[in-house]
C-alpha cells in the first residue's frame, strides 16, 4: 500500500468517528444562581419549622373558647359635621363563663367588629358572681334600671329559660338553665339588660341570709333547696 493511500484512510476514519459532546464549564452566573436557590430553600424550610403565626393565635382562640359571648344589639350612630355625616357603631355585649360569672359591656367604634371587641373587653372588666342553686336562682327577685323592670323567679328542673331576647342572653351567659322571667317596663334592650344585671346582683345565698338573721339554714330555706345546696357542695 502506498503512502498516499494510507493518508486517505486516516482522513476517512477521522471524519466517520462520532464527535463526543463535552460539557461546557459552569459559568460564574450559573454558580451564583444555584447558590441563591439553595439559600431560598433553606429560608423556606426555616419558616416551616417556626410554624407560621398559628402558635401566637392559638392563645387567643383558647381564651375565646372559655367564655360565652352574646351580642344583644348593634346600633349605628351618625354625626353631622361640616363635610357631611360620620357614622359609627355601638355594640351591647354580654360575656360569661357559663358557671356563675357574667359581665356587660358597651363598645363604640367606627367598625362593627371593633365595637364588639371593645364591648367584650369592657364586659370582662365588670365580671361578678351570681348565686345559684343547681340550674336556677335561690329566690324571687326584681331589678330596675332607668325605665326597665325585670322580674326573675326560680323554676324546677326541666322548665328551661322562659325569657325574652335580652334577658335570655344574660341568663345563658350566667349558666342558668331553669328560670321564669318577665319584663315589666321599658322595651329598650339596654335598659332590659341592665335591669336583669341589677336583679342578679340582688340575689343572696341562703346561708348568708341565715347568718344575718341568726337562724339555722333549715328555717330559712325549704328542704328541697337545702338538699340541692348539699348536693352542689358535694359536687353531685
Swiss-Prot record:
Region (Disordered): 1-64
One GO BP: translation
Database matches in InterPro entries: Ribosomal_Su5_D2-typ_SF, Ribosomal_uS5, Ribosomal_uS5_bac-type, Ribosomal_uS5_C, Ribosomal_uS5_N, Ribosomal_uS5_N_CS, Ribsml_uS5_D2-typ_fold_subgr
Pfam families (alphabetical): Ribosomal_S5, Ribosomal_S5_C
PROSITE patterns: RIBOSOMAL_S5 (PS00585), S5_DSRBD (PS50881)
Gene3D superfamilies attached to this UniProt entry: 3.30.160.20, 3.30.230.10
A GO-annotated cellular component: small ribosomal subunit
MF terms (GO), sorted A to Z: rRNA binding; structural constituent of ribosome
Similarity-based family: Belongs to the universal ribosomal protein uS5 family.
Oligomer status and interactors: Part of the 30S ribosomal subunit. Contacts proteins S4 and S8.
Protein name: Small ribosomal subunit protein uS5
Organism encoding this protein: Arthrobacter sp. (strain FB24)
Source species taxonomy: Bacteria, Bacillati, Actinomycetota, Actinomycetes, Micrococcales
Amino acid at each position: 500500500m502506498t503512502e498516499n493511500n494510507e493518508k486517505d484512510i486516516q482522513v476517512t476514519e477521522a471524519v466517520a468517528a462520532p464527535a463526543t459532546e463535552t460539557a461546557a464549564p459552569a459559568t460564574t452566573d450559573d454558580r451564583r444562581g444555584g447558590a441563591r436557590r439553595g439559600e431560598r430553600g433553606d429560608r423556606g424550610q426555616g419558616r416551616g419549622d417556626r410554624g407560621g403565626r398559628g402558635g401566637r393565635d392559638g392563645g387567643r382562640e383558647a381564651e375565646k373558647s372559655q367564655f360565652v359571648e352574646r351580642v344583644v344589639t348593634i346600633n349605628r350612630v351618625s354625626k353631622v359635621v361640616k363635610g357631611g355625616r360620620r357614622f359609627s357603631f355601638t355594640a351591647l355585649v354580654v360575656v360569661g363563663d357559663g358557671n356563675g360569672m357574667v359581665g356587660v359591656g358597651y363598645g363604640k367604634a367606627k367598625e362593627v367588629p371593633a365595637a364588639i371587641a371593645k364591648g367584650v373587653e369592657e364586659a370582662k372588666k365588670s365580671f361578678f358572681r351570681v348565686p345559684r342553686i343547681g340550674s336556677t336562682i335561690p329566690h324571687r327577685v326584681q331589678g330596675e334600671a332607668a325605665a326597665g323592670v325585670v322580674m326573675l323567679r326560680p323554676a324546677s328542673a326541666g322548665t328551661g329559660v322562659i325569657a325574652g331576647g335580652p334577658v335570655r342572653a344574660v341568663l345563658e351567659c350566667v349558666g342558668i338553665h331553669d328560670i321564669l322571667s318577665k319584663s315589666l317596663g321599658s322595651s329598650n334592650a339596654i335598659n332590659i339588660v341592665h335591669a336583669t344585671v341589677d336583679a342578679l346582683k340582688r340575689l343572696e345565698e341562703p346561708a348568708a341570709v341565715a347568718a344575718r338573721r341568726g337562724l339555722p339554714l333549715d328555717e330559712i330555706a325549704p328542704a328541697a333547696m337545702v338538699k340541692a345546696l348539699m348536693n352542689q357542695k358535694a359536687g353531685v
